[in-house]
Curated annotation (Swiss-Prot):
Originating gene: glyA
Pathway note: One-carbon metabolism; tetrahydrofolate interconversion; Amino-acid biosynthesis; glycine biosynthesis; glycine from L-serine: step 1/1
Subunit structure: Homodimer.
Organism: Clostridium botulinum (strain Langeland / NCTC 10281 / Type F)
PROSITE patterns xref list: SHMT
Full protein name: Serine hydroxymethyltransferase
Entries under InterPro entries matching the protein: PyrdxlP-dep_Trfase, PyrdxlP-dep_Trfase_major, PyrdxlP-dep_Trfase_small, Ser_HO-MeTrfase, Ser_HO-MeTrfase-like, Ser_HO-MeTrfase_PLP_BS, SHMT-like_dom
Binding site for (6S)-5,6,7,8-tetrahydrofolate: 119, 123-125, 351-353
Site (Plays an important role in substrate specificity): 227
Gene3D superfamilies in the record: Aspartate Aminotransferase, domain 1 (3.90.1150.10), Type I PLP-dependent aspartate aminotransferase-like (Major domain) (3.40.640.10)
Length: 413
């Protein structure tokens, strides 16, 4: 990208950006929630739309001069509705967390009971963690996975729901590698007359391309981020049934946000258009193929995969049998140029700052053009680095750099 002005006005900051650019260019990015946006997304994000205040919604603003940003937001909303066949869309949430907060506030009261997935079983902070606003403002209770299969225990979920009769059931996850049965959860919600909310932030790209069943026909509310598998700017969005549209919109503004970030909404519109194209479907199909191959190769090296494998874009790995913690594995792999994140596993015995596992995903490397053969090499690099962690691993780091050179991030930037 062109940094001519920044070079003159703030070379100190530009130096930091350049170092991060180099890190992204020469490292294998396996954090499941990260991706590389297109240059078009970045151009929209860096446009002069950032100058415009636009409190309110299209054609009902609290500021003048909004006729063109109204067009931008309308375009983003219509594209998002088309992408997921939804009745209503709100593209103003600054993040997935704020999208979740807005849904809770739209139909619930402080202190109401909500049933969500346990964080250590694959849920998310905003699904009831006691350190998060969700756990502080609402009475969250948790469901999790079966100890044997390590997949969602729907019988347990139903039992807890019948015993506690929550006002809402939240599904979706940040570290769950299997298909989620939204139809079954809808049936449980109907039995206790509860709202159904799905946080599909991680799997939105899979849902958009038919590689994961859509929650939209079943859920009252669906939230998502626009980065991760959707490959857009950092931000959030909400889909809902038309009957909840006013409540959701009011919860975002004036409920928890002021002016929307119009440059980000423009970038969201770009990514929704990209996700409607046929080549995006091919990309997501390759993501799933890559994840499955990477998982099988790691299993061949003796790594234990939570639930035994994956149906989506990510793998959760229990490192106990490798005699290394998630924290140490993250640091070790980072030293050779593979970026992962430490992650708790179901029935975790270690602190969330240490963890027994790591979470990895393939959306970012697939965006670069990596395919099955590269997945086999990544599995080899990971295994070799962990098995030979007391040795000099400079040759592995060099091999990783060479692979990255074959798949440059932004060839024409």
């Amino acid at each position: 990208m062109d940094f001519t002005n920044l070079k003159n006005t703030d070379p100190e900051l530009l130096d930091m950006i350049k170092k991060e650019e180099e890190r992204q260019e020469y490292n294998i990015e396996l954090i499941a929630s990260e991706n590389f946006t297109s240059l078009s997304v970045m151009e929209a994000m860096g446009s002069l739309l950032t100058n415009k205040y636009a409190e309110g919604y299209p054609h009902k603003r609290y500021y003048g001069g909004c006729e063109f940003v109204d067009e931008v937001e309308d375009l983003a909303r219509e594209r998002l509705k088309k992408l997921f066949a939804a009745e209503h869309a709100n593209v103003q949430p600054h993040s997935g967390s704020q999208a979740n907060m807005a849904v809770y506030m739209s139909v619930l009261q402080t202190g109401d009971t909500i049933l969500g997935m346990d964080l250590s079983h694959g849920g998310h902070l905003t699904h009831g963690s006691p350190v998060n606003f969700s756990g502080k403002l609402y009475n969250f209770i948790s469901y999790g996975v079966d100890k044997e299969t390590e997949t969602i225990d729907y019988d347990q979920l139903k039992k807890i729901a019948l015993e506690n009769r929550p006002k809402m059931i939240v599904s979706g996850a940040s570290a769950y590698p299997r298909i989620i049965d939204f139809e079954k959860i809808r049936e449980i919600c109907d039995e206790i007359d509860a709202y159904m909310m799905v946080d599909m932030a991680h799997i939105a790209g899979l849902v958009a391309t038919g590689l994961h069943p859509s929650p939209v026909p079943y859920a009252d509310f669906v939230t998502t981020t626009t980065h991760k598998t959707l490959r857009g700017p950092r931000g959030g969005a909400i889909l809902c049934k038309e009957k909840y549209a006013k409540a959701v919109d009011k919860a975002i503004f004036p409920g928890i946000q002021g002016g929307p970030l119009m440059h980000t909404i423009a970038a969201k519109a770009v990514c929704f258009r990209e996700a409607l194209r046929e080549d995006y479907k091919e990309y997501m199909q390759q993501v799933v193929k890559n994840t499955k191959v990477l998982g099988e190769e790691l299993k061949n090296y003796g790594f234990r995969l939570i639930s035994g494998g994956t149906d989506n874009h990510l793998l959760l790995i229990d490192l106990t049998n490798k005699n290394i913690t998630g924290k140490d594995a993250e640091k070790l792999l980072d030293s050779v140029g593979i970026t992962v994140n430490k992650n708790t596993i179901p029935f975790e015995t270690l602190s969330p700052f240490i963890t027994s596992g790591i979470r990895i995903g393939t959306p970012a490397v697939t965006t670069r053009g990596f395919k099955e053969e590269e997945m086999k090499k990544i599995a080899y690099f990971m295994n070799y680095s962990i098995e030979h962690r007391e040795e000099n691993l400079s040759q592995i780091k060099e091999q990783i750099k060479e692979i990255c050179k074959k798949y440059p991030l932004y060839q024409n930037a």
